[in-house]
């Protein structure tokens, strides 16, 4: 190993980080139909269609439960306005179950518009937010063999940490897609709860949860954009001193900044719930 290996190791770790940030932008701007060529989406559509029959059964059950609970006897149904109200309620709930797929896609498109607006107003994702400063490279190139041994340890640990954090970041974004698929596939069952006012809270909670998952993309994009702007405003300080102290300070500050971003991305669901009251 030599000094060039130390620089190359750090640059490779930062390149992996930049690559994962670019991949995040591609994922959050991608529709469920486009993800992985649409193969997963086709399965989700099939499951959604198969569960519609169960949704209709639950809809009738919930509607009957609400009807029997709210009408002591059927005298109330003799009034045209009461009968019309129950009829319209049932028709609206049935339409929600029948067209739950277009409903879910419409919600996703609206939230996707929020993501595009956020990115568009701020100029999109930055290209390379992490680049090794020239003074760090120069300091590493000037050290001798014995002095470079501590640098090997620092760069190995720092590079490993940066690489692991970059994969944690991308795994969090991938998990959002899987949550979108789960919500969409199972949609007919919880939406059938709108058949009765007593069970409608379940349907409302489901839709709120789905909106929250969709809006996670906006929080993720905004977090990455703020991180990119922060890193673009200047590299972490590289104070004068030994090469080991300079590299250690640089790596420590980079790791701290990355930890903040990873924490925001992983907590995007909690942030959305707190902001939107979901």
Regions found by a protein language model. Give the residues of each.
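Alpha-helical transmembrane segments
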Residues: 191-208, 240, 271-275
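Hydrophobic transmembrane alpha-helix segments characteristic of membrane transport
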Residues: 58-94, 186-200
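Loop-to-transmembrane-helix entry motif
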Residues: 47-54, 90-94, 167, 171-174, ...
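Alpha-helical transmembrane segments and their helix-start/interface "positive-inside/aromatic belt" motifs
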Residues: 1-10, 80-100, 203-213
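Alpha-helical membrane-interface segments at transmembrane helix boundaries
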Residues: 44-52, 84-88, 92, 141-144, ...
């Amino acid at each position: 190993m030599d000094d060039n290996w130390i620089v190359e190791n750090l640059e490779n770790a930062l390149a992996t980080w930049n690559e994962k940030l670019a991949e995040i932008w591609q994922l959050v701007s991608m529709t469920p139909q486009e993800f992985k060529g649409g193969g997963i989406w086709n399965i989700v559509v099939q499951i959604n269609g198969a569960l519609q029959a169960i949704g209709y059964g639950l809809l009738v059950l919930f509607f009957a439960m609400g009807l029997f609970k709210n009408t002591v006897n059927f005298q109330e149904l003799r009034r045209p306005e009461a009968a019309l109200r129950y009829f319209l309620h049932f028709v609206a709930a049935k339409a929600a179950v029948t067209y739950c797929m277009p409903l879910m896609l419409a919600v996703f498109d609206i939230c996707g518009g929020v993501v595009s607006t956020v990115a568009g107003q701020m100029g999109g994702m930055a290209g390379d937010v992490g680049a090794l400063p020239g003074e760090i490279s120069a300091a590493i190139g000037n050290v001798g063999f014995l002095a470079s041994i501590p640098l090997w340890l620092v760069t190995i640990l720092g590079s490993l940490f940066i690489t692991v954090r970059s994969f944690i970041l991308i795994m969090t974004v991938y998990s959002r897609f899987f949550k979108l698929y789960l919500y969409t596939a199972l949609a007919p069952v919880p939406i059938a709860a709108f058949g009765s006012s007593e069970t409608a809270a379940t349907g409302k909670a489901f839709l709120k949860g789905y909106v929250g998952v969709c809006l996670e993309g906006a929080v993720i994009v905004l977090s990455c954009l703020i991180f990119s702007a922060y890193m673009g405003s200047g590299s972490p300080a590289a104070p004068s001193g030994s090469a080991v102290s300079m590299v250690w300070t640089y790596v420590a500050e980079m790791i701290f900044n990355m930890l903040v971003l990873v924490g925001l991305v992983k907590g995007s669901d909690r942030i959305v719930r707190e902001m939107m009251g979901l």
